């Protein structure tokens, strides 16, 4: 039987019979920081390395990787993002890696565990003048992890985005 336990900003998924374990940090962008499936370690805790320096297993949105000089053009309009990788003059990995997600749904039974998390951003950011909401759904089974991400544009204008998942 799967169980889901929450302790402050950490969700743990367990199934002793199937050797499944997962640990999600709500206050680190809903990142999956540990994962074992069928007794095999897939994602290992990187302690003593700090999450803020590694972005380990973080969901990357609205852009993955680096935007050189933080500059991009969309619909013939130029935008300037804040530079958060100063030594290389890049905007890096988007905006949600340090945001706190809210638990919307938790379901656990003998075959799987499902967790749905939500983050709503109503603040306009430098270089990204759009609002959005994000749903992240993790489904754990004995031999698989399924990750679904749903982005809803809550603005009146279309916006560019990509989604990535940091190793």
List the model feature ranges, each with a label:
Residues 1-150, 154-163, 167:
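Surface-exposed acidic/polar loop and edge beta-strand patches at domain peripheries
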């Amino acid at each position: 039987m799967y169980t889901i336990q929450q302790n402050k900003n950490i969700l743990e998924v367990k199934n002793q019979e199937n050797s499944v374990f997962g640990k999600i940090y709500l206050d680190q962008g809903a990142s999956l920081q540990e994962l074992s499936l069928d007794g095999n370690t897939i994602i290992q805790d990187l302690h003593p390395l700090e999450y803020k320096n590694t972005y380990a297993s973080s969901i990357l949105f609205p852009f993955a990787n680096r935007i050189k000089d933080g500059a991009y053009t969309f619909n013939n309009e130029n935008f300037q993002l804040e530079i958060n990788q100063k030594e290389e003059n890049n905007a890096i990995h988007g905006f949600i890696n340090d945001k706190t997600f809210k638990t919307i749904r938790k379901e656990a039974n003998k075959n799987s565990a499902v967790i749905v998390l939500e983050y709503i951003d109503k603040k306009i950011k430098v270089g990204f003048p759009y609002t959005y909401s994000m749903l992240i759904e993790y489904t754990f089974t004995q031999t698989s992890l399924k990750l679904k991400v749903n982005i809803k544009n809550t603005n009146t204008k279309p916006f560019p985005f990509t989604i990535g998942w940091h190793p």
